[in-house]
Structures are given as C-alpha cells and as structure tokens.
Amino acid sequence: YGHDQGDYAIKRICNEIIVSIRQSDSLYRIGGDEFAIILVETNISKARTIGENIRKRIEKVVAVGQDKITISIGISSFDFNNESEDEEKLFKRTDNALYESKNHGRNRVSVITA
C-alpha cells in the first residue's frame, strides 16, 4: 500500500486509542507500528478491558483499502512499592505479553504480571 496508506493507518489507530483512554493516560509511539500506553492508577482487570475496547474499535473501523487492520496488545503492571521494580523490567514484561499475543494468532490482548 505504500507510506501514505501506512501513515493514514497509524493516524487512525492513534485516534481510536486516544478516544479510548482517559486524559490522565498517555500514548507513546515507540517504533514504526508499536505504541505504549500508560494507564495511570489502573488495575490489570481494567487495563485488559481498555485493551479489549481498543482492539475491538480498531478492528471495526480502521482499514487500508479493503483490508481490515487488527492489533495485538501486551499488558503488564508496575508496582511502585516494589523497590526491585524498574521501567526496564516493566517494558520487558509488556513486550513479552505483546509477543504472546502475536504468537497466538494476533488480534488479541495478553497480560503478564510481575
């Protein structure tokens, strides 16, 4: 499809994510087609629900040409009270959850906790 269609898809995905999260949450693009969302003061159950809502919205409304776009989502948590916890461990767990989604058929949400 080319760069123009890819850019269009990424913008649409961002818009769908933005309307699915709260103002206190943050969306970051961390790679070509990879994003991170920080859900402030959100437990794993609520994060999974938000992830599923985002996945369903994108599956329903984002397309390039005749092809529907799907996403895979990985979720993990960060415990501020655990002194051995750090951002690198959180990112690694979340990345592992993402690859679990990708390895099990894509278009799904996976959770790995500490």
Predicted regions and their residues:
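Conserved long alpha-helical elements within nucleotide-processing catalytic cores of c-di-GMP signaling
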Residues: Y1-V19, Y28-G32, A36-I37, I44-E52, ...
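Catalytic core regions of nucleotide second-messenger enzymes
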Residues: R29, R57-G74, K102
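Residue-level recognition of strand-loop junctions within catalytic nucleotide-signaling folds
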Residues: I38-T42, E59, F78-D79, A114
